[in-house]
Amino acid sequence: MRVIDSHTAGEPTRVVLDGGPDLGSGTLAERAARLEAEHLDFCASVVLEPRGHDAIIGALLVPPSDPACAAGVIYFNNLQNLGMCGHATIGLGVTLAHLGRIRPGRHRFETPVGVVEIDLIDANTVSVVNIESYRLAKDVTVEVEGVGPVTGDVAWGGNWFFLVKNSPIALTGANIRPLTDLTLKIRTALEKAGVTGKDGAWIDHIELFGPAEDPAAQSRNFVLCPGGAYDRSPCGTGCSAKLACLAADGALAPGQDYLQESVIGSTYKISYQPGPGGGVIPTITGQAFVTSDATLIFNPADPYRSGIRL
């Protein structure tokens, strides 16, 4: 199985070029559902130890249903499929450019939640025009064990987020473990309180905000991903959810740039335009770098060929 590894603002992506499972025909959403239902061992083998680690996002290239798209892609992590992934889309654009499959300019990628457009600006810089994002609920308060009441917004940016404006813990590298523990507790509190996304969807990402360390940035964040890892990047879908909240509050004008900093200090430049459904169409600009071109080997005698799951 050939893969290309990259990182976007510190967050890793592994693009699977060949050797993936046969997902049959149908829409990309149908094929993504088939991947999650029937091929979890494949996903685990690609992103988990001993070949990977819990922060890697997999990106399986598949034929697009829409012939106008340069690629079809299904994103997955160490737990499940992802409807959309901003950092991995930037990484995919840079990977395809590295392979000579796309050139600078506008391109379309088909994802399970819709078509996204990218602008390949140079060999390492990509702007992603994401799907329409929106806020579902404002100022939702839940009682968090050992912490007390925590208030945040519920918003969609390609995945479901609970966004907390003022983190009770400083967003520093030294606090990664307590920040992870806190966000896991918040997610559990949401589940116990029955707080969900649209149609009962699981809110699988928790996003905390605080003051930026970079004087050019407006905010710093910490993002808990579904499998319990933290996002090294500012999180593209999380930025999209944040833009939806800023727009709904009248705190950011259409087309106005906003610099979002991650917990490791990397940044995305983000902005939005009004969406046709009342939400926002986010644009996320960041940089990615290819780190390896590898062949994954699966030995039938290897007891951990499908990954280590604890």
UniProtKB/Swiss-Prot annotation:
It catalyses: trans-4-hydroxy-L-proline = cis-4-hydroxy-D-proline. Catalyzes the epimerization of trans-4-hydroxy-L-proline (t4LHyp) to cis-4-hydroxy-D-proline (c4DHyp). May be involved in a degradation pathway of t4LHyp, which would allow L.aggregata to grow on t4LHyp as a sole carbon source. Displays no proline racemase activity. Induction: Is up-regulated when the bacterium is grown on t4LHyp or t3LHyp as sole carbon source. InterPro entries: Pro_racemase_fam. The keyword Metal-binding does not apply. GO terms for molecular function: 4-hydroxyproline epimerase activity. Gene3D superfamilies: Diaminopimelate Epimerase, Chain A, domain 1. Keywords: Isomerase. Its EC number is 5.1.1.8. Belongs to the proline racemase family. This is 4-hydroxyproline 2-epimerase. It comes from the Bacteria. It holds the Pfam family Pro_racemase. It comes from Roseibium aggregatum (strain ATCC 25650 / DSM 13394 / JCM 20685 / NBRC 16684 / NCIMB 2208 / IAM 12614 / B1) (Stappia aggregata). The keyword Nucleotide-binding does not apply. The active site is at residues 85, 235. Substrate binds at residues 86-87, 205, 231, 236-237.
